Amino acid sequence: MEGIKQTFQRCKAQNRAALVTYVTAGFPHPEQTPDILLAMEKGGADVIELGVPFTDPIADGPTIQTANTIALQHGVTLQSTLQMVRDARQRGLKAPVMLMGYYNPLLSYGEERLLNDCKEAGVNGFIIVDLPPEEAVSFRQLCTRGGLSYVPLIAPATSDARMRVLCQLADSFIYVVSRQGVTGASGTLNANLPELLARVKKYSGNKPAAVGFGVSTHDHFTQVGAIADGVVVGSMIITTIQKAAKGEEVKAVQEYCSYLCGRNFEQSAHELNMGEALEAAKEPVGTATVDGVITEADIDAQLAALHGTIPKRFGEFGGQYVPEALMDCLSELEEGFNKIKDDPAFWEEYRSYYPWMGRPGQLHKAERLTEYAGGANIWLKREDLNHTGSHKINNALGQLLLARRLGKKKIIAETGAGQHGVATATVCAKFGMECTVFMGAEDVRRQALNVFRMKLLGAKVVAVEAGSRTLRDAVNEALRYWVVNLADTHYIIGSAIGPHPFPTIVRTFQSVIGNETKQQMLEKRGKLPDAVVACVGGGSNAVGMFYPFSNDPSVKLLGVEAGGDGVDTPRHSATLTAGSKGVLHGVRTYILQNQYGQIEDTHSISAGLDYPGVGPELSNWKDTERAKFVAATDAQAFEGFRLMSQLEGIIPALESSHGIWGALELAKTMKPDEDVVICLSGRGDKDVQSVADELPIIGPKIGWDLRF
């Protein structure tokens, strides 16, 4: 921390802005990183940000995403990143080094261990993109105790009230994001940057402010350096490395840094003359007095006051692990949701669309499935009969009505199987709102029918080629897009995932499933069901079915995840069955990750369940043992698909088929006078081609042959 402070003080004494440079650890190769750090310093860098690679860097543009991917392919971990710092220090690196990145790899490493190892390796502090101060209380305390810096970020969207608190938190400098959006070099600077910096300086006192995002040329450096204490350059350094001839990367970095700032190491590492030394050693004149002391507890209380009243956690799960640019937008969303959740006029409007949606939904006994299982009565809650063919319409309509009250004109969504995308495109068509749906390229391939349905409805469909090209990657791109377009765009997230208040919003609109089930079972059976069953991906239909029964201990809650090829293989999506606690897409929950906190690729025959995370409320129900979760393999899901089709004349979605298999297994263990309700979350016409494609492989496992 002190090293960073002294660096900014020295730059100020020399009447210049500090050059803060970024490179991803292990890019282009781990062996080159210490040389690149030294080259940055020789080229005039005053402070160095070393990026810790992560599989899902939602705040970064394509350039740094690529660098992360390459570093991970080289096997770079947090441990090896710290070794790179040690190696550079041993070879003479003097510049302060900040670790920059995302929280999950750090959380996986262990906060206390991380702080100790970082201090020993020669790291000076942290810039953690998705760890806002509200979520970093213990981490900040550890940093303070260890003399390491926690650098807050401020974005153009940050309100004055929030900015005031963030500036108080800063212990070395403040990182100012020059524009809304993701990282990346640009041809022009934000024209509103002087105004943004003026706002920052209003609250920052004498704390330095360094500006990043979009700086790429010497002119940019000069312009920003004239009004800021530091200038951050990252993406253009990655690009410089990419463009350099093999073996010339280190030299190219040094030359680029020198070009940016017009200086080099020889100019900046001069000996202090006697006058400078005496000036630096002077005692302050008079006795220093203070008018008050602001403690960490005071700051935490101020942060809490910026938020609404809805609890943002379910036990230890939930929270808002997002880039600073989203924080005030989420507060706006929470405030808007608070206004409508208990407003009779809103719910009257919502229910006025029931005839269009196909609600109230149907519930009936599955006679032949019951006979087949030979145990409890099996009932079907028919969300597949809703308009658009799934439960997704419940949430899409509710969030669109909320977005209109917030004054948003455009809607974005992510989708896996396409059902949420279709539901969102449908409500946007009805209300005349522009709609963009992000969908993994692999899901576009296997759900081509739903892609065409979305386009028929007037939506724009963006295929995401990054990563595993599935739902997780669609969420990443949707979040990146939203950060850029907060002013006029609402993100209708499709599952009970994401940062607070999204899990609560989605649960609220999906609870119509469980509320109707409870009422209908009382009418038909005069009692509550003994168990309710739902498939689980992100958890939207499960949380909607389970929540109304969560305080009824006589009702078992069973969630059925995607077991893929089996949870004893790497090819599954069974997050609650086989995952561990971590942070993904803005929320602390169970996730599928490796030992280094990197997110694992997943597999399911069902695109809608092919996701490495799950809603935080479901995670809490798992830990408190309120709900039980099991996994059904692809073959077992096919068995559920076949039985529902051939015994009840209902072709279910492959997602729902997982729940069907789990419910049948449960019903077999129960008494004939007991009742199990399955949430039949969607219809299966979208999956017929997938079943036909996979049947030659899976069919023999379950004795099912439909070849002509």
Curated annotation (Swiss-Prot):
What EC numbers are recorded for this enzyme?
4.2.1.20
Q: Which domain of life is it from?
A: Eukaryota
Q: Which cofactors does the annotated protein need, by name?
A: pyridoxal 5'-phosphate
This protein's pathway reads:
Amino-acid biosynthesis; L-tryptophan biosynthesis; L-tryptophan from chorismate: step 5/5
Q: Where along the chain is the active site annotated?
A: E49 (proton acceptor), D60 (proton acceptor)
Its cellular-component GO annotations read:
cytoplasm
Q: Where is this region: Tryptophan synthase alpha chain?
A: 1-305
One protein family per Pfam: PALP
Q: Which reaction does it catalyse?
A: (1S,2R)-1-C-(indol-3-yl)glycerol 3-phosphate + L-serine = D-glyceraldehyde 3-phosphate + L-tryptophan + H2O
List, alphabetically, the InterPro entries matched.
Answer: Aldolase_TIM (IPR013785), RibuloseP-bd_barrel (IPR011060), Trp_synth_b_CS (IPR006653), Trp_synth_beta (IPR006654), Trp_synth_beta/beta-like (IPR023026), Trp_synthase_alpha_AS (IPR018204), Trp_synthase_suA (IPR002028), TrpB-like_PALP (IPR001926)
Q: Where is this region: Tryptophan synthase beta chain?
A: 306-708
Q: Does the keyword Transcription apply?
A: no
HAMAP family xrefs? Trp_synth_alpha, Trp_synth_beta
> Which family is this sequence assigned to?
In the N-terminal section; belongs to the TrpA family.
Report the protein name in the record. Answer: Tryptophan synthase
